[in-house]
Each structure stands twice: as structure tokens, then as C-alpha cells.
Amino acid sequence: MDKELNNVPYTHGLHEVADNVFAYLQPDGGWGWSNAGLIASEWSSLLVDTLFDLKLTQNMLDSMSSVTSAHPINVVVNTHANGDHCYGNSLVGGENGAQIITTNAAAVEMKAIPPSALEALMKIDLGETTNSYIQDAFGPFEFSDIELPSPDRTFSGELQLDVGGRTVELIEV
């Protein structure tokens, strides 16, 4: 079934935007409310990004289960190192079996600001104005108990993947 991108509503949840290509949307898309993608092939799937915390990521994975039950996620690609694109990696990577792939630069950045740093930042008194800003930006998210697995594979430039017989090209920008 061909989908026209113009006909995809900007509503919360999973939307098929092309044959076996899905967008997971989180309106309003503000700070921390990132989107993710899912590319399903004949027997597996590639997930583009996880979300900012484990609860949000689990809700997303639950909404994808109608696809991933027949096409399990075996690759996760993190587009960059911001937490709202990778802090849910432990739910699919590591012991859960999916290979995590990102750029060399993103892999270095992922180590620089672990989830525990944001958790600690939320507990420090930095004055009313800064505390208010931090609460607005990070208050809706839960950073405790997040263990961020290291990427299994990194690249620079371009990388071509075979995801269950479907070619996916990654391009570092």
C-alpha cells in the first residue's frame, strides 16, 4: 500500500508512511519529544532512534508490536547522541539482542552526558530561573535506572545495511 506523506496526520503514535516504513510521532515535537522510525523487511526491522526515557520507549515499542511481532527489531540506528534519540536503547539493544549503530562522533558524545547527569542536574539548586528552565525541559522525563549501552558498530561517512533483504543506506551529515 502506497502512502502519501501529506496524508499522514501529525498525531501521537505509529503511522505507516510508505510500504513497511513507519513514523512514530510525539506531537508537539518540542524539546525531548522526539520522533522515531521503523523500517520493516521480510523478516526483521530497523528502528531509527529510541526515546528520552524507558517508559516512553516502552510505550513506543508496544505500539510497534503489531509490526515487530512478525518483523523483530534487530538493528537500532541512533541518528545522534542527544538523549531523546538514544536513552531508550537498553530496551532493544544489549541483552535484548538488537545491534546498535551510530556514527563515530555520536558514539563519543553518548559517553559524555549519561542519563545520570541529567538526573543529578534536576536535583541541584541552581536558582529559581535555571531550576524552572530545567524542570520545563526535563521534568516530564524519568532518567533514573537508565543504563545506556555502547554502540555495537560505528561508522563515518556512509554505511549500507542489509535489513532482512532490504537495503538501508546510512549517511552521516
Residue ranges and their predicted role:
Residues 1-21:
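N-terminal amphipathic/basic leader segments beginning at the initiator methionine
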Residues 10-11, 34-35, 157:
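Residue-level marker for the onset of beta-strands and adjacent loop->beta junctions
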Residues 15-68:
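Conserved beta-strand hairpin/beta-sheet module of binuclear metal-dependent hydrolase folds
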Residues 16-17, 108-172:
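Metallo-beta-lactamase
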Residues 27, 50-51, 80-81, 105-106:
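Active-site metal-binding loops of divalent metal-dependent hydrolases
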Residues 43-44, 55-102:
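Active-site metal-binding motif and surrounding structural segment of the metallo-beta-lactamase
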Residues 52, 104, 165-167:
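A mature extracytoplasmic/lumenal domain signature
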